[in-house]
Curated annotation (Swiss-Prot):
Belongs to the TrpA family. It comes from the Bacteria. PANTHER family: TRYPTOPHAN SYNTHASE ALPHA CHAIN, CHLOROPLASTIC, TRYPTOPHAN SYNTHASE, ALPHA CHAIN. It comes from Pseudomonas aeruginosa (strain LESB58). GO terms for cellular component: cytosol. This is Tryptophan synthase alpha chain. CDD domains: Tryptophan_synthase_alpha (cd04724). Transmembrane segments: none annotated. It catalyses: (1S,2R)-1-C-(indol-3-yl)glycerol 3-phosphate + L-serine = D-glyceraldehyde 3-phosphate + L-tryptophan + H2O. Its EC number is 4.2.1.20. PROSITE patterns: TRP_SYNTHASE_ALPHA (PS00167). Gene3D superfamilies: Aldolase class I. The lineage of its organism: Bacteria, Pseudomonadati, Pseudomonadota, Gammaproteobacteria, Pseudomonadales. GO terms for molecular function: tryptophan synthase activity.
Length: 268
């Protein structure tokens, strides 16, 4: 079993959802970003999504766009992001880590090289937001052949006819974007989330993670009662943007992660 399968199976036994945290590699700088990454499991993150900075993150809202700019201004590259995972893995072998981003940097790096190095440094899966299933052979199939999970995004506008196509070849978990729009947008109603989870469960046995718009422990707990995973990104990244310095940013992100984890763990 993959690290993702193992983690979700273990949490199912515990009858609770996973807290899935998203941060951007290299934000606010390499050292602070690595410190955040290393601190997330102890703060309560069950799965980590690590953003690969890109100059044109079109699916992301202002918070993550600014995080991309901060990281790129600090010299973050895809090679440095893979190195960051290697350093994280030197002390943490159980928490699943998924790289999330866009196809362009991977394409420029070289797909075969990227997959080989991602596997070697301890990446567990990929979320590539601008690569539809019609392009599975570009990355999804070779990644899975190498033992990396490929996690698909579904949205409120993904209809029942389209869902089987989107889910075909998905592995790890399904990431349901509960609001059609950019990351960090307003949250969906819980009724909408409940209906969406029920609809997805008719099409897949994979765990379902819900993201976009979750900002507080209370909201995380409410979503954790309905889904297998609660994904939080913009709220954590806002803490970095608002911190007076990088040391404070590390503390504030890990503190919020702890609050969210408590909400998720006490939800059911």
């Amino acid at each position: 079993m993959s690290r993702l399968q193992t983690r979700f199976a273990q949490l199912k036994q515990e009858n609770r959802a996973a807290l899935v945290t998203f941060v951007t590699a290299g934000d606010p700088d390499y050292a602070s970003s690595l410190e955040i990454l290393k601190g997330l499991p102890a703060a309560g993150a069950d799965v980590i999504e690590l953003g690969m900075p890109f100059t044109d993150p079109m699916a992301d809202g202002p918070a993550i766009q600014l995080a991309n700019i901060r990281a790129l201004d600090g010299g973050q590259t895809l090679a440095r992001t893979l190195q960051m995972v290697r350093e994280f893995r030197s002390g943490e072998s159980e928490t699943p880590l998924v790289l999330m981003g866009y196809f362009n940097p991977i394409h420029h790096y070289g797909v075969e090289r990227f997959i080989a190095e991602a596997k070697e440094v301890g990446v567990d899966g990929l979320i590539v937001v601008d690569l539809p299933p019609e392009h599975n052979e570009d990355l999804c199939h070779p990644a899975q052949a190498a033992g990396l999970d490929f996690i698909r995004l579904t949205t409120p506008t993904t209809g029942d006819q389209r869902l089987p196509t989107v889910l075909e070849g998905s592995s790890g978990f399904v990431y349901y974007v509960s609001v059609a729009g950019v990351t960090g947008a307003n949250a969906a109603t819980l009724e909408h989330v409940e209906e969406a989870v029920a609809r997805l469960r008719r099409h897949t046995d994979l765990p379902i993670g819900i993201g976009f718009g979750i900002r507080s422990a209370e909201h995380a707990a409410a979503v954790a009662r309905l889904a297998d995973g609660v994904v939080v990104g913009s709220a954590l990244i806002d803490r970095i943007a608002k911190a007076r310095d990088n040391a404070q940013a590390v503390k504030d992100v890990l503190a919020l992660c702890g609050e969210l984890a408590e909400g998720v763990r006490n939800a059911r």
